[in-house]
Curated annotation (Swiss-Prot):
Keywords from the named record: Host cytoplasm, Host nucleus, Late protein, Virion, Virion tegument
Subcellular location: Virion tegument; Host cytoplasm; Host nucleus
Transmembrane segments: none
Any coiled-coil regions, as ranges: none
Species per Swiss-Prot/TrEMBL record: Varicella-zoster virus (strain Dumas) (HHV-3)
Physiological role: Plays a critical role in cytoplasmic virus egress. Participates in the final step of tegumentation and envelope acquisition within the host cytoplasm by directly interacting with the capsid. Upon virion binding to target cell, a signaling cascade is triggered to disrupt the interaction with the capsid, thereby preparing capsid uncoating.
Record's GO cellular component terms: host cell cytoplasm; host cell nucleus; viral tegument
Protein name: Cytoplasmic envelopment protein 2
Length: 363
């Protein structure tokens, strides 16, 4: 995949070739906004090497060469080499950065760089790139294949471990629905979720770790074996710099009941042991109705999102005390989104993501 470039990338040819001011600014914006978290690959007194992965966006696509690996055609792997050469006399907090994409093409610049820890996650960092100045590539360019991503620091994440108490937006209606009880706040630029209290996990089937409402409803209301679309949704390991990860309900906030996602159905029968519905309601239910997404609002009230009925068709009150509103931090929210093609299309439609996910359904 290669998009037609709508602006020139370079100011010259040959050894003096470097990015134009417009291109290097776009590159900085892409590294800051469109990548996942950054994993430290190597740190020594001379150079710091970091790596990040995400789905390719229109902002980053002009810097990516034509890909021959059809298994990861929409994925970008960025490796950065950070140094402070004495002969450049760089200002404080400014570094020389070589950026490599997909182990094939590199660019050089200086930039004001801020690297900061991400709350509750070890070995990965957030990063911002500002005030870039393009430079020609040095004669000797490092090979990122010589510095593989450490295999022992790549756990399968459970997003429930990273939930934070919410700081509510002033306008709860300025949001996009990702799945029932999961929202992107346009105002706060972060994800908000309804999640059950940890003590309710004991009421769930063995091996169940999902606490976020969309994932719980997916388990309760989707067909047991899943459909091809559900089972083969592609995710990038944007939290740990992995080009791909195994699908699992705890690893992304995109999970939702299959027929709600694909067909816009809002009234769905429980597909598992109805006893498991007691994590949501004060008694067992056989049918759950999901609120319309046409006028969404971030809410801490479970009853604003779902309603349930029993086998006799009578309403069953929700278990509101067992569910709380949480949020993810801004940096982590952006990484979660950049690792999921569906979330990219919902949260950042203005960037016209390239992951090939279908358009979300409004119900």
């Amino acid at each position: 995949m290669e998009l037609q470039r709508i602006f020139p990338l370079y100011t010259a040819t040959g050894a003096a070739r470097k990015l134009t001011p417009e291109a290097v600014q776009r590159l900085c914006d892409a590294l800051t906004l469109d990548m996942g978290l950054w994993k430290s690959i190597l740190t020594d007194p001379r150079v710091k090497i970091m790596r990040s992965t995400a789905f390719i966006t229109l902002r980053i696509a002009p810097f990516i060469p034509l890909q021959t690996d059809t298994t990861n055609i929409a994925v970008v792997v960025a490796t950065i080499y950070i140094t402070r050469p004495r002969q450049m006399n760089l200002p404080p907090k400014t570094f020389h950065v070589i950026v490599n994409f997909n182990y094939e093409v590199s660019y050089a610049m200086t930039a004001t760089l801020r690297i900061y820890p991400v709350e509750n996650i070890d070995h990965v960092f957030g990063a911002t790139f500002k005030n870039p100045i393009a430079y020609p590539l040095p004669t000797s360019i490092p090979d990122p294949r010589a510095d593989p991503t450490p295999a022992d620091l790549t756990p399968t994440p459970n997003l429930s471990n990273y939930l934070q108490p919410p700081r509510l937006p002033k306008n709860p209606y300025a949001c996009k629905v990702i799945s029932p009880g999961v929202w992107w706040s346009d105002e706060r630029r972060r994800l908000y979720v309804l999640a059950m209290e940890p003590n309710l996990i004991g009421l769930c089937p063995a091996g169940w770790h999902a606490r976020i409402l969309g994932s719980v409803l997916n388990r309760l209301l989707s067909h047991a074996d899943g459909c091809d679309e559900c089972n083969h949704r592609v995710h990038v390991g944007a939290l740990y710099a992995l080009p791909h990860v195994t699908n699992h309900a705890e690893g992304c906030v995109c999970w939702a009941p299959c027929m709600w996602r694909k067909a816009g159905q809002r009234e769905l029968k429980v597909e598992v042991d109805i006893g498991a519905t007691q994590v949501l309601f004060v008694d067992v239910t056989t049918c759950i109705r999901i609120t319309s997404t046409k006028n969404p609002r971030i809410t801490a009230n479970l009853g604003d999102v779902i309603a349930g009925t029993n086998a006799s068709g009578l309403s069953v009150p929700v278990n509101s005390s067992g569910w709380q509103l949480y949020m993810f931090g801004e940096t982590l929210s952006r990484a979660i989104i950049n690792g999921c093609g569906l979330l990219q299309r919902i949260c950042f439609p203005e960037t016209q993501r390239l992951s090939g996910e279908p358009e979300p359904t409004t119900t």
